[in-house]
Design a protein with these regions (language model features):
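A membrane-cytosol interface segment of integral membrane proteins
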Residues: 102-164
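Short, aromatic-rich membrane-interface segments at the entry and exit
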Residues: 35-42
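Single-pass alpha-helical transmembrane signal-anchor segments
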Residues: 24-25, 42-56, 183-189
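Short beta-strand segments
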Residues: 78-80, 101-104
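Short acidic, Gly/Pro-enriched loop/turn segments at secondary-structure junctions
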Residues: 92-103
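Conserved beta-hairpin
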Residues: 51-82, 86-94
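N-terminal membrane-targeting/pre-transmembrane regions
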Residues: 1-34, 142, 149-194
Length: 194
């Protein structure tokens, strides 16, 4: 993986940080107003919520490199070489199409359907869109998905023009994340309902 570039929206850190602060405040407040059982229940629920937000907002990212792309979602990490990608686009989020299957990137969410009304023609220069007169809202350069799609198309075009060899495709399941999530759910249910 040479010349790698990672894309993750900065707003993800803001949302996750806000949840962490809220959970810390709830835990602090419970020490003053709850019994030991209430404090433990609050800690369990706050840890579960904070970890779910960590998986949903902080972990997802898209990594572009000369040979391919890696899409990291909460419980899966998919690496695909540029030569295997049939299409790059954005519907609900940025996606790549490989072998007829669409792989969506959680890190590059598309905006609402009315966003395309606010796009000006000057924003589309140099993006090499297939049909610049009929742009999807998710391909706007002012959106998370639009930035990721533009970066992916630039990297794929460079790959094709240089006749490089793509990387091998791989899929990795986030066992550690899934195990931690399952343990937190079990402990939270045990503390809450026992």
């Amino acid at each position: 993986m040479s010349n790698s570039e990672m894309y993750r929206p900065r707003s993800s850190y803001f949302f996750a940080g806000a949840i962490y602060i809220l959970c810390a405040g709830l835990i602090g407040q419970s020490f003053f107003s709850e019994s030991l059982e209430g404090v433990l229940t609050t800690i369990a629920w706050c840890l579960l919520v904070a970890y779910v937000f960590h998986l949903s907002f902080v972990r997802p990212k898209v990594t572009f490199f000369d040979e391919g792309i890696t899409i990291t979602n909460p419980l899966k990490e998919i690496t695909v070489g540029w030569g295997e990608i049939e299409d790059i686009g954005a519907r609900y989020s940025m996606y790549i199409q490989v072998g007829g299957e669409k792989i969506y990137a959680w890190a590059a969410q598309a905006p609402g359907r009315y966003h395309s009304r606010n796009i000006h023609a000057s924003e589309l220069r140099g993006l090499n869109l297939p049909d610049p007169l009929n742009i999807r809202a998710g391909e706007s350069p002012r959106t998370h998905s639009g930035v990721a799609v533009a970066l992916a198309r630039i990297r794929r075009d460079a790959f094709i023009s240089k006749n490089l060899i793509g990387c091998e495709s791989s899929t990795h399941f986030n066992r550690g994340g899934a195990t931690t999530l399952a343990i937190l759910i079990a402990v939270t249910c045990l503390i809450t309902f026992a």
